[in-house]
Amino acid sequence: MAAEKLRDLSQPIDVVLLDATVEAFYSTGSKEERASADNILRDLKANPDTWLQVVHILQNTSSTHTKFFALQVLEGVIKYRWNALPVEQRDGMKNYISDVIVQLSRDEASFRTERLYVNKLNIILVQIVKQEWPAKWKSFIPDLVIAAKTSETICENCMAILKLLSEEVFDFSKGEMTQQKIKELKQSLNSEFQLIHELCLYVLSASQRQELIRATLSALHAYLSWIPLGYIFESPLLEILLKFFPVPAYRNLTLQCLSEVASLNFGDFYDMQYVKMYSIFMNQLQAILPLNLNIPEAYSTGSSEEQAFIQNLALFFTSFFKLHIKILESAPENISLLLAGLGYLISISYVDDTEVFKVCLDYWNSLVLELFGTRHHACHPALTPSLFGLQMAFLPSTVDGVKSEVTERQKLYSDPMSKLRGLMISRTAKPEEVLIVEDENGNIVRETMKDNDVLVQYKIMRETLIYLSHLDHEDTEKQMLSKLSKQLSGEEWAWNNLNTLCWAIGSISGSMVVEQENRFLVMVIRDLLSLCEVVKGKDNKAVIASNIMYVVGQYSRFLRAHWKFLKTVVHKLFEFMHETHPGVQDMACDTFLKIVQKCKRKFVIVQVGESEPFVSELLSGLATIVGDLQPHQIHTFYESVGSMIQAESDPQKRGEYLQRLMALPNQKWAEIIGQARQSADILKEPDVIRTVLNILQTNTRVATSLGTFFLSQISLIFLDMLNVYRMYSELVSSSIANGGPYASRTSLVKLLRSVKREILKLIETFLDKAENQPHIGKQFVPPMMDQVLGDYARNVPDARESEVLSLFATIINKYKVVMRDEVPLIFEAVFQCTLEMITKNFEDYPEHRLKFFSLLRAIATFCFRALIQLSSEQLKLVMDSVIWAFRHTERNIAETGLNLLLEMLKNFQKSDFCNKFYQTYFLQIEQEVFAVLTDTFHKPGFKLHVLVLQHLFSLVESGSLAEPLWDAATVPHPYSNNVAFVLEYTTKLLSSSFPNMTTTEVTQFVNGLYESRNDVGRFKDNIRDFLIQSKEFSAQDNKDLYAEEAAAQMERERQRMLSIPGLIAPSEIQDDMADS
């Protein structure tokens, strides 16, 4: 192929041939042609000398695609190799790019036709600026401003460059540049902003050219968030922006600028200017958009520009109110404009656009939190510091003053807050528990996939409704009951109206005092049950059923206190279990489980007016209740009844209830086992296998809820289960041995293996949930050593169940050192054979990988002495497998491997084998961890990489190591100590891995690691900066490097939510639910 000539870069590249190759890649040619072109272009990009041909290519091609290809090559060099280039090459490229931009933007015609190319050149120039400025290109900003004044089109493009520069430094810099470089660029932009400011004012005052004014407003928008406020409030800038606001061509860009100004907050120095700005803005807005206009309707029929205006308006109001609403509150003359602004925002909140609603919702959430916070601290001054993180001391004399101020504030906001309650009730998002939805064709169906965006929105709306309920319980109750009565009367009957209302009712669970909640719920449940009776049609009844189930599932406190309601609700759920409309039975079973888990004690005592506990009555009619349920629904039901039985404190009654619950499955089990004793072939029939599987799954769910009390039931079937396990295992093995790998995918083998897995899962579930009683371990573990472990070792790889590994991990985690003597047997049975399965590549046997390393971690944590007793060959295998684990790109496996490694490092440090272990493995571990830390595929493991390296760097100074880490036979000169050796070794290791970094930079980093070894925060920051400096992590999504900080913030938020009644739903709070 002629294009192969392009690989030869010893002479100027054939641009015509390059054009043809690039076009072949982008064209609709054959797949082979595109693949061939792709290979050549990739090789050219990878070749370190291609960039030297960029100028030649740009000067000789007319193809936009080829120009972009050349600029991509250049961009890579600028990002990763720029500082290694000779000064003359850097200056030459910098001047060439600048000249091309000026040439193309000087002429109106070329500027418009080549706009895409100019935009890409601008990006390249800004990448160069980030490297060169300010140290090596001090005159960049003055040069740009001078060029801007030579022609209006050049000025327009200069504005685009200035916008790009601000975005690169202030918006996209985190994770791409070191903290020091970001700081340097920000200081330079700040110090030279006066020139930019003067240029913008000059253009906005003097130019009549629409494109230039729009480009200037757009650039200004990028700068307003960080420039000193004096440039805004002590110059004509704000006045000019407000002058442009009524002009339709500039309205949206001006509004974006005003939103940026509104989002700034530097104390109260400019408060009066903010009030003046808001006042002028509101007067202008009411002329453009009358307050009585139906904004949602106007939005739905408006142009894209008009819709963008409403979106920007939402951003302006929310930004302004978040920071400056208190200024408007403080002066009576501003109150009417403040209420008008809130009125606009409530009207905008009804717009049928998810993004607009998210913006509004975020503000409403913060406003009601703030109103609730001030009210809460007025009523409970002693509690507030701990609730809201305020360090204040409240004197009795100040509390009354605060209370009266809060009362006035509540009066001011009472009307907007009442309207906001109406908004929230009418737009509540669907909670996760609701399984019944309306599809795009208007049919009521079972939900097939969760929408995470909707769940996040529900969480925020629920929190907002909780605060609104706390601010005025009566108004909340009144609005909800009024809307419910309109559902009953038919005045507002509609699926969506009932759904959002019931979701809102369910969401405020826990926010009312007990007496009010009781009164409220009695009316709600009665009305919903009445609605179910009067409304006809299967779809209608399904919608009402789902709402009844959702509401009752949220109010366990009410149900615990009202037995008759609880019994009525449960009987209603039993009724729904016979309703075959998609989703109703699933939701009925899920709701029953949720209620039982929170009210279980109520079902095992004899209630007033009853002759026996409810659980006994239920067990008598068990077959009828579950008669129409599918197997998976029956399993959920059985788990629920198991929860009830677990609450019974009398062992004799508990045993009797369990016997009655398991009577049907036990009867079927005994029948199958009895037949199998006559002829084992019965166990090979697919229908029998399915029945066995179903029985085992039922047992597993009951074991989940009963824990230790399941002992009598599992003892009854345990040995028979092991026999079934052995028989099915032999069938699977012989099928795979005779039929090859394909046999493992046949329906019969899949079914047999499902039974094996369920047996293992049942045993694991019971042992995990049972209390730590040694006699249980002694009863169940020995029979499994051959039947399960031996079977695993003997089987062909494709027939080995990964659940064996997790079962024995659970056993070791549960019984700890008691299992130490068994570890060699476990090791012998699973280690070597599993390792052979998972180390051929990173893909095969994914389940075995994770569970194998979880088992190793359990052994390392609780039976470490057993690891020490391994031979050096076996220990090497363990260490190799650990390294193999954290090299894995599957996050769970890599994290399990790193946690296991940390566990072993700490344990070996405390052991007698410390010196021997670290002499053998210290350098290998350090090398391997640095390899995964710096390769960008393992970023989620960043926190653990840091902890491993911190351990290693701390270890060399700790005194734990009495022997040298270097090999005296191969190292020509001895080191004074291990610290000196490790620092030098690490510097050499990283210098060879990152040739683009100087030895000084690497040495500085390594010394920084050593100096910060006792401060994990500084240690982590050093590594983050190094990763960015090394260029390996530039232009990547680096949020994983900050994951630990994000997790800590989430925990602080959870603690705050726990302190406010209702914010975490009662159904989500873990408690013992003794129901006394």
Swiss-Prot record:
<keyword id="KW-0813">Transport</keyword>
<feature type="repeat" description="HEAT 2">
    <location>
        <begin position="232"/>
        <end position="267"/>
    </location>
</feature>
<dbReference type="InterPro" id="IPR041123">
    <property type="entry name" value="CRM1_repeat"/>
</dbReference>
<comment type="function">
    <text>Receptor for the leucine-rich nuclear export signal (NES). Binds cooperatively to the NES on its target protein and to the small GTPase Ran in its active GTP-bound form. Required for the maternal-to-embryonic transition and during gametophyte development.</text>
</comment>
<dbReference type="GO" id="GO:0009846">
    <property type="term" value="P:pollen germination"/>
</dbReference>
<keyword id="KW-0653">Protein transport</keyword>
<keyword id="KW-0906">Nuclear pore complex</keyword>
<dbReference type="GO" id="GO:0051028">
    <property type="term" value="P:mRNA transport"/>
</dbReference>
<dbReference type="GO" id="GO:0009506">
    <property type="term" value="C:plasmodesma"/>
</dbReference>
<dbReference type="Pfam" id="PF03810">
    <property type="entry name" value="IBN_N"/>
</dbReference>
<feature type="repeat" description="HEAT 3">
    <location>
        <begin position="282"/>
        <end position="319"/>
    </location>
</feature>
<dbReference type="GO" id="GO:0005643">
    <property type="term" value="C:nuclear pore"/>
</dbReference>
<dbReference type="GO" id="GO:0005049">
    <property type="term" value="F:nuclear export signal receptor activity"/>
</dbReference>
<dbReference type="InterPro" id="IPR016024">
    <property type="entry name" value="ARM-type_fold"/>
</dbReference>
<dbReference type="Pfam" id="PF08767">
    <property type="entry name" value="CRM1_C"/>
</dbReference>
<dbReference type="InterPro" id="IPR040485">
    <property type="entry name" value="XPO1_repeat_3"/>
</dbReference>
<feature type="repeat" description="HEAT 1">
    <location>
        <begin position="135"/>
        <end position="171"/>
    </location>
</feature>
<dbReference type="GO" id="GO:0009860">
    <property type="term" value="P:pollen tube growth"/>
</dbReference>
<dbReference type="InterPro" id="IPR011989">
    <property type="entry name" value="ARM-like"/>
</dbReference>
<dbReference type="GO" id="GO:0006611">
    <property type="term" value="P:protein export from nucleus"/>
</dbReference>
<keyword id="KW-0217">Developmental protein</keyword>
<feature type="repeat" description="HEAT 11">
    <location>
        <begin position="943"/>
        <end position="988"/>
    </location>
</feature>
<dbReference type="Pfam" id="PF18787">
    <property type="entry name" value="CRM1_repeat_3"/>
</dbReference>
<feature type="repeat" description="HEAT 10">
    <location>
        <begin position="895"/>
        <end position="935"/>
    </location>
</feature>
<dbReference type="GO" id="GO:0009553">
    <property type="term" value="P:embryo sac development"/>
</dbReference>
<protein>
    <recommendedName>
        <fullName>Protein EXPORTIN 1B</fullName>
    </recommendedName>
</protein>
<dbReference type="Pfam" id="PF18777">
    <property type="entry name" value="CRM1_repeat"/>
</dbReference>
<feature type="repeat" description="HEAT 6">
    <location>
        <begin position="613"/>
        <end position="650"/>
    </location>
</feature>
<feature type="repeat" description="HEAT 9">
    <location>
        <begin position="799"/>
        <end position="836"/>
    </location>
</feature>
<dbReference type="GO" id="GO:0031267">
    <property type="term" value="F:small GTPase binding"/>
</dbReference>
<keyword id="KW-0509">mRNA transport</keyword>
<dbReference type="InterPro" id="IPR045065">
    <property type="entry name" value="XPO1/5"/>
</dbReference>
<feature type="repeat" description="HEAT 5">
    <location>
        <begin position="564"/>
        <end position="601"/>
    </location>
</feature>
<dbReference type="Pfam" id="PF18784">
    <property type="entry name" value="CRM1_repeat_2"/>
</dbReference>
<feature type="repeat" description="HEAT 8">
    <location>
        <begin position="757"/>
        <end position="794"/>
    </location>
</feature>
<feature type="repeat" description="HEAT 4">
    <location>
        <begin position="475"/>
        <end position="514"/>
    </location>
</feature>
<keyword id="KW-0472">Membrane</keyword>
<keyword id="KW-0539">Nucleus</keyword>
<dbReference type="Pfam" id="PF08389">
    <property type="entry name" value="Xpo1"/>
</dbReference>
<dbReference type="GO" id="GO:0009555">
    <property type="term" value="P:pollen development"/>
</dbReference>
<dbReference type="InterPro" id="IPR013598">
    <property type="entry name" value="Exportin-1/Importin-b-like"/>
</dbReference>
<feature type="repeat" description="HEAT 7">
    <location>
        <begin position="683"/>
        <end position="720"/>
    </location>
</feature>
